[in-house]
């Protein structure tokens, strides 16, 4: 059976973790520091801290923002449930937003609606590696915390502007901005099936110096039990170094699978090409019976899984989700097919054939 997920742990990752164990330096230390430095260079952020869980990372972000208790925090209905759970436990009120059908993401219109209902901060989950209308959302003027667990490495071209130097007009250069650089803070999950895994944990990043200065006051006083151990950090470090190689492999597979899917009646989400998005699994929005598709794939020895089985909407009562019609439909109809760098060409061809002949 071809499994839906693989963490793509190769010999390099195994050797790095084994060396960490042999050196008996498994707690937070030098390797955590090296991982953070590499991540800062990769993302261009001003500062970052690696924690033992995404929930802990979020708690420090909200401390730094100084969000009053009871404030409504906006979340996507298709975001991972840990966000909803953490927001409640930290003393805030989750305000769940619907998504747009083509991308599975919240857009500026739904966020504006959330603001009108009292939302004062947005946790923006960039699901499936797709970037939303992020500039339009940030322009609404509320604090945004990006979740780049799927979208790390995605790049949004920035419009070039004309600039003045005091005497003459100059044409500004077009610059690209990476996922994670738009919000006040961003969270990079390192959980088992995140794009970069450390076997658990998360990194809280501050893109701008002014925000890092504030955040650092809190993280400098963090308990050692909040900080990511070296044994996790070294795994994440090697994964980060291998990111470009792995991402190119994922993109090549995605292109093959997407072409195959186009011959049938089902679809995947709309995304920007090339660096405008990154690849996390292969989501398929089914036009027919999920049960029939699952049985068909299983007969071909391919495991598929519901895309949003651990999402916010998966835990809400019917009364709570009655206005989340698009999210509900995508929750029920979207499945994930295997897509990861270790798939061989023969296996990839087998998956592509199934995608092109789905019921």
Stretches with model-predicted labels:
Residues 50, 75, 204:
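Conserved SAM-binding loop
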